[in-house]
Amino acid sequence: MASQYFAILTDYGTQAFAKALSSKQPLQLATFAVGDGNGQAVTPTENRTALVREKHRANVSAVTLDPRNNKQVIVELTIPEDVGGFYIREMGVFDNQNKLIAYANSPESYKPTEGSGSGKVQVLRMVLLVSSSNAV
């Protein structure tokens, strides 16, 4: 059975990783965005250039290499408790040129704010399968 939730490199992201490897210049994963898919579940496609409906974007919190698989890069976003009031159904990672590198769908999750009576810090991770983690 195929995975219902997954992350993919966009067409641009695939080219950017290849260029980073060939030029030996690391790819700068700069920002991480979340969106609500305009109220609908989304399916990742390589030709995507933006989230369906972006709700929050911030600098990437961390980029790490998977210690068990050197072809996986883990990108993290921490959303503080004072940001929210929306559902999360999609995620995207952007480079320092504001171009979408990777896109993922996720199970629907509500991100509350403290003002609603239930604030929480939320950490999201996107795991990217790449040909070589040397590009990051």
Give the label of every model feature segment:
Residues 1-136:
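N-terminal assembly/attachment segments of tailed bacteriophage virion structural proteins
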